[in-house]
Amino acid sequence: MIHAYDKLYLDKAQTALGRMLDFAVYELHHTLEDFFTLFLKTGLADRFGSGDYELLVGMSGVELAYTVLEEAEKPVNRKKIPYTADRSPEYWTGWALAYYQWDTALSFREIIQVVPIAEIVAMYTPYHEMDIRQFVDHMNERYLKANPDTNLKRLRTRAGLSQHALAETTGVPLRTIQQYEQRRKNINKAQAEYLLMLSRTLCCRVEDLMEKVIPSSE
């Protein structure tokens, strides 16, 4: 699986996003939903999710929260806040969400469109006591339920091709195409030749065929 950025920065990213949300709610007195909307609208979420070194490593969660407000042109009254070791539900939300975004390389917007931030914070109990992979599996199930079609099926349909026609044109076996579209075979592990022929026929990039969310059974 291709992750959003180097794992070297993951721990820092989780801490920063968790602290940002905790600080925004408990010190800046924003609602979780409103503040995360600002995070998305300012473009900082996209930068963070793509591994922007300045945001992942160069800022603390508190600094990131202030930057969101500044970018959104909201009033900012900086104050010195003592570090707290408390781990609120909002902190866990940022911590877990940062991990999931890194793991799947989905954008934060794509994630929130399927599972709103209010629903994620509501998962604090019981998921904060579980291994993070159980949270990931649950989020993946939600995402796949909301997006049942694979990228291959979506691109094939857009091109106006049947499975049989795509197989005839590309030389990829019909059964293999069916298995990719049914998620019974992982297209991310497909032969390079298959991916190249499919991308040429469907007028897309090879990476457009890849799946960011894979069923846990795979």
Residue locations for each model-derived region?
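N-terminal interaction modules that seed assembly of large macromolecular complexes
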Residues: 10-67
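Short, basic-rich loop-to-helix N-cap that marks the start of a DNA-contacting helix
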Residues: 57, 184-197
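DNA major-groove recognition helix of helix-turn-helix/homeodomain DNA-binding modules
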Residues: 65-73, 192-208
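A short, Lys/Arg-rich alpha-helix, primarily the initiator
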Residues: 138-160
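Conserved hydrophobic/aromatic packing and binding residues within compact polymer-binding modules
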Residues: 152, 166-167, 177-180, 209
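Short coil turns linking two alpha-helices in DNA-binding domains
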Residues: 162, 173-176, 191, 205
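Recognition helix of helix-turn-helix/homeodomain-like DNA-binding domains
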Residues: 172-188
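Short, charged recognition helix plus adjacent turn
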Residues: 210-218
